[in-house]
Amino acid sequence: MTERDYTTFETIDLTSEEVLQCSYSNWSKLFPGKTFPSKIIKPLPSTFLDYLASESIRLPSNTNNKKITVLEADSDNEYSDWDDEEDQQQDAEHNDNVFSQFQDIQDKIDASIQEMGGAVFTKLNWSSPKDAKWIMPGNTIKCQNVSDVYLLLNSSDHIGDDLDNPFSEVQKKKTIPEKVDYELVLTKWQEINPAYEFRVFVKDHRIIGISQRDNNKYEFLQGLKSELNEKITQFVEDHVIPKLKSDTQLSKYIVDVYVSKNDIYIIDINPFSRKSDSCLFTWVELLDKKDKHDNHHELRLVENQNFAKEFSESQVPIEVVGATMDTEAMVELAREWDKLQAKEK
């Protein structure tokens, strides 16, 4: 094997400060009118963060569910449920006690949802729970009440990573802060066309690539490719790059944008790291663009239909999805799981 056969794994010098500057509240305030209306709830108490990080899914008892069902993983990663009335009553009391510890957060979520028209989508500092939309009726991240918000946040691996490993890609571990000021972001729900969502990669204050975000093929985009490239490039070069260059220390980052009929909106700004999806590029391709004077970049669109489901690594069999919509079905699913585990022992 010759030297040409090897691909050098190039590290990305990501700093903890870059990660923090990509926290929603830090960058969104720089772009008034260029983001969708949002409410930021912070600081978040440790009791609320512990609730999000727990291995059980608990929802407030003042929902429409007449019966509270709580599934918890034990040390063997097996699941059990409570059948008798006494256990259910005890669990209901514990459930109420858990939520009473951050009732003010729940009240703020309720108020924010109402203020923004009755529907929002949610995220923490960096990630949204898109990977957990399978658990919601209608396969959506649209939240219309507190329980929707809690269910998505509790079920998301992306949110878990925000809580447990926000600085995992930072090389200089000694610079990592001991404490993170977490925030809950509630953004007014928008009916958007996923075909017009794009991811822009910026390095050394210049665009090095633009990619379609949705993994479906849209024939009509091919005819708009040149126009979209021009519009997105102009927006990022005129608004995003100059502002982040003057007001932050960011020189590399990833910008998610939505191209509407009359404007372009910033959906998110992410750290420039392999933890972020490189979409239709490879990280080798992106990191190979080292000439700071080369302003040429490519916009890539999906050319072949992709039948793989997005976030499939975070999804579960259809029986589980059905169970999430029916508490009795969820209990029955837990019983069947225990029976299967017992047979294997």
Swiss-Prot record:
Keyword match GTP-binding: no
Q: Please give one Pfam family short name.
A: D123
Q: Does the keyword Transcription apply?
A: no
Function noted in UniProt: ATP-dependent protein-folding chaperone for the eIF2 complex. Binds to the gamma subunit of the eIF2 complex which allows the subunit to assemble with the alpha and beta subunits.
Binding of ATP, residues:
K123, W126, S128, K130, K188, W189, E197, R199, R213, D256, D268, N270
Gene this protein is translated from:
CDC123
Annotated InterPro entries: CDC123
Task: Output the Gene Ontology terms for molecular function.
Answer: ATP binding; magnesium ion binding; protein folding chaperone
Q: Where does Mg(2+) bind?
A: D268, N270
What is the name of this protein? Translation initiation factor eIF2 assembly protein
Q: Which family does it belong to?
A: Belongs to the CDC123 family.
Q: Which species expresses this protein natively?
A: Candida albicans (strain SC5314 / ATCC MYA-2876) (Yeast)
Q: Where in the cell is it found?
A: Cytoplasm
Q: What is its main location?
A: cytoplasm
